[in-house]
Amino acid sequence: MAQTLYDKIWQAHTIASINEQTDLLYIDRHLVHEVTSPQAFAGLREKNRTVRCPEKTFATMDHNVSTKSRSLDAASEVSKNQLMALDANCKEFGIVLYDLNSINQGIVHVMGPEQGITLPGTTIVCGDSHTSTHGAFGALAHGIGTSEVEHVLATQTLQQKKAKSLKIQINGRLRPTVTAKDLIMAVIGKLGTAGGTGYVAEFCGEGIEALSMEARMTLCNMSIEMGAKAGLIASDQITYDYLKGRPFAPKGADFDAAVKYWETLKTDDGAQFDHVVELEASSIQPQITWGTSPEQVIGVDECIPDPDKEPDLIKADAIRSALKYMGLKAGEKLSSAKVDTVFIGSCTNSRIEDLRAAAKIVEGKKVVAGIEALIVPGSGLVKKQAEDEGLADIFKAAGFEWREPGCSMCLAMNDDRLGAGKRCASTSNRNFEGRQGRGGRTHLVSPAMAAAAAIHGHFVDIRGEA
């Protein structure tokens, strides 16, 4: 019987069937950070349990760290306590930790792939919803809650109900200056934030095959924003070239043998999906969210929707509420709204390709006076590479702040927060009310779009910048 990629990974990791809908799965990799792990470790200690597979558990500091300093003292008292607890827990239970003194420290979903921890065909979990990022490698990866973090630490297993399968076919290739961020935002705009609920999505087609690994990570990162349990892209030569030589990837003959197995992990011809969606890549333009949900998104040259023209009364009310919070008017273009802050970073867009795209836009230009502009690399390795390539110098010369790695302004859990009423062009993944700070107004965009907003003071069509 023909199988999807999801079917194959699920079957390979099923230890036992709990009932007709639920199986017990083996977990290959467990990623840990300071926010969702303290209670899990405390639970182990209370029950006198050990970590079953510390060699398959990897930790980093990311959510609460200061991006202005590598000192623990730069974090708030609560954040510092969580960071210190992670350090103590990893030492006690024998877990690899990339702390603030390590060049490998970074956002967990940047660190995992660049270390070769993320591999095709594996099951990966983390106490963070954007674990879907790792699906770009053909891995089944998703977020879990703190009680499940404890369970995986103790057993290296997880009970899961198998989801339905969703195929998202991208025909043709994206146009120049249109990125994977624009693609996934367009998909979310089409399906809505509940369109993927109950599904694991597989992205395929020429438009996906043409993407780099970093672009694929951006795409899968926001699978959760359309409600999907996980996002998958079958591995290929681009994947294998990315992984070869990375610290935790197989080496030599073992790598060659792994590739032979990974090449079998593709959806079979004739395999049936529960739902199929198709998009033409060439029809997608640079995207911007205008509201307070990732599905409230428009193309850069489109107008903000009018609630009076929306036949769905619930959607119309949602539009009115979002317009009020965002301080916008229906029928306007977003170029009329001035930007106060620009944030380029997060697990969605803080990799070297993202920084190169932003630097290309800002080189030789200046950030508009009064705009706070932050560049926060996703890891110490990304930071060093950007500095070696001269990108950091370009950003600093333009007036950007060049920060240390961390989750930063993606979420208001550290000192990088958006002020009330301030409008931010952000390369992060969520634009909910208060996500970046109480009263803050978030517009999700690609790195190039964010960079262009910094030097113009408002959103512009970057197709005219290239």
From Swiss-Prot:
Spell out the SUPFAM superfamilies in the cross-references: Aconitase iron-sulfur domain (SSF53732)
Q: By its UniProt entry, which PANTHER family does this protein fall under?
A: 3-ISOPROPYLMALATE DEHYDRATASE (PTHR43822:SF9), HOMOACONITASE, MITOCHONDRIAL-RELATED (PTHR43822)
Per the UniProt entry, what are the Gene Ontology biological process annotations, in alphabetical order?
A: L-leucine biosynthetic process
Q: What GO terms are given for molecular function?
A: 3-isopropylmalate dehydratase activity; 4 iron, 4 sulfur cluster binding; metal ion binding
Keyword Transit peptide present in the record's keywords: the answer is: no
Q: What's its EC?
A: 4.2.1.33
Pathway this chain belongs to: Amino-acid biosynthesis; L-leucine biosynthesis; L-leucine from 3-methyl-2-oxobutanoate: step 2/4
Q: What is this protein called?
A: 3-isopropylmalate dehydratase large subunit
The free-text function statement in the UniProt record for this protein reads:
Catalyzes the isomerization between 2-isopropylmalate and 3-isopropylmalate, via the formation of 2-isopropylmaleate.
User: Which cofactor(s) are needed, names only?
Assistant: [4Fe-4S] cluster
Q: How is the cofactor bound?
A: Binds 1 [4Fe-4S] cluster per subunit.
Entries under Pfam families matching the protein: Aconitase (PF00330)
Does this entry carry the keyword Transferase? no
Alphabetical list of NCBIfam families matching this protein: leuC, PRK05478.1, PRK12466.1
Superkingdom: Bacteria
Q: Residues that bind [4Fe-4S] cluster, according to the entry?
A: C347, C407, C410
Task: Identify the keywords attached in UniProt to this record, alphabetized.
Answer: 4Fe-4S, Amino-acid biosynthesis, Branched-chain amino acid biosynthesis, Iron, Iron-sulfur, Leucine biosynthesis, Lyase, Metal-binding
> What family does this belong to?
Belongs to the aconitase/IPM isomerase family. LeuC type 1 subfamily.
Write out the catalysed reaction: (2R,3S)-3-isopropylmalate = (2S)-2-isopropylmalate
Subunit structure comment from the entry: Heterodimer of LeuC and LeuD.
